[in-house]
Amino acid sequence: MKLSKLTMAIAIILAGAIGITTLATNSFNSFTTPSNPNDNTVLNSTIDTIDAVVVQPSQLANQWIVSPAEAKYLIEQGAIVLDVRDRDSQTNGMVQGAIAVSWQQFSQSKFPHQGKLLEDELALTQHLRNVGVFSNKAVVVVGDPLNGWGEDGRMVWMLRTLGHQQTVLVDGGYLALSRVDLPMTQTISQAAAIPGDFVIQRIRDWEITQEDLRTRLATRKNLVVIDAREPREFAGATPYGEQRGGHIPGAISLHYKELLDAEGHLLPRSKILALLRDRHVPSNAIIVSYCTGGVRSGWLTSVLVDLGFQAQNYAGSMWEWSAGSANQNHLVNH
């Protein structure tokens, strides 16, 4: 709910009194506590640059996306930083102490299952501990919204699904985070100096398997399927190794980057909700997103959950779906 003008004025006066001089809003409308489509409270902090920001651990249970200032606060309080950008970008600078990771190191390697998480939970646990993931420490994931593939959202979706409920991505990615006076380095680290202690406690709310998707498609009860790929892929192009082209019948085309502005920040919440309404996405639907290998759709799932939607990522996505029988895994070309 929005604060009154009087309350806002008092807040600004008090801020000035303690030396906080810069208040700027990010794309989710400052000083608001957005409601989700079902009127349950979702805490999305919205202060982009402020000298003092406090993020409570309880807030992160529902908040999957943070502003650069909130990320800075979390990092200064000891959060683990995972950098999912490409190596060339990392060479030009990383947050000091960040660990360079890729979504592939936590995923299966054999076609057509490259989008799915490792089946061996012991191996997956060890990989996460090696990069410094602790059960009781926040994890801040840094990506490249403009030039990447939504790897930061994929990483957040993965860790949340595996039971780490203090994992967040930074709105605006590395470029935005580099503007909030954090120490930087050009040294690339791929393993933490102190291994983490994370234990997987899987949460099924945000994932769906191929078999479950087939079942849901047969009834389509309260189901919306979103194709997070480019329009050309939706229409049948196969630039990334899919066995067959097209899209899942009834899917809505929504390229995930439609939710970003020219600087890589998320669009204002109101605009995202309007965009979803225009694509005929009901507020109370269960939304299943897919792409090629669950990366772009993982990002979209993270954003949708942060907004308060019931959202699931089909990690197998088109690599797996298109490799299945055409009689079972139908595709539409147009």
Question: At which residue positions do the language-model features occur?
Answer:
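Active-site neighborhoods of enzymes that stabilize oxyanions during catalysis
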Residues: 54-64, 74, 175-249, 326-334
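Gram-negative bacterial Sec-dependent N-terminal signal peptides
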Residues: 6-22
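N-terminal module-boundary/linker segments of secreted carbohydrate-active enzymes
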Residues: 43-80
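Thiolate-centered catalytic microenvironments shared by cysteine-dependent enzyme domains
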Residues: 4-7, 39-42, 47-55, 119-207, ...
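C-terminal soluble interaction/assembly domains
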Residues: 272-274, 282-334
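Helix-loop module immediately N-terminal to the HCX5R catalytic loop
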Residues: 108-139, 256-286
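Short hydrophobic beta-strand that contains or immediately precedes a catalytic carboxylate
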Residues: 71, 80-85, 101, 225-227
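Signal peptide processing junction and immediate N-terminal pro/mature segment
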Residues: 19-49
